[in-house]
Amino acid sequence: MKNEVILNKISTIERCIKRIQDVYGNDPENLEDFTKQDSIILNIQRACEASIDLAMHIVAGKKLGLPQSSREAFDLLVTAGLLSADLANKLKAMVGFRNIAVHDYQSVNLDIVRQIIEKHLTDFKLFT
């Protein structure tokens, strides 16, 4: 059962990355299309949530502590030697982006979305 949860989260992350890449198509102008923009942002959000779920699952399974936030789950993985601090910081930044996108704290900066697509989708893959 535990491996099934892990495999499911990894599959979700991979599916989201593929969807983002398909919709973006290596063309920043695709971010000007609101439908494509929504699809991309939603899939970044889903990949982030699946990464958080995966981190929480590993933390619970290995009894690494009780994280008080999703960001802290990544910190506990670093402390346990299961994740590099550099990758943890990148994933925690994704959590910040997710919070902006989900809770609409401020409008989403499309330059940040483009940078995530072009430079940071691999961070999700490295985590899986």
Residue ranges: model-predicted function:
Residues 1-128:
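Solvent-exposed interaction patches of small proteins and small membrane subunits
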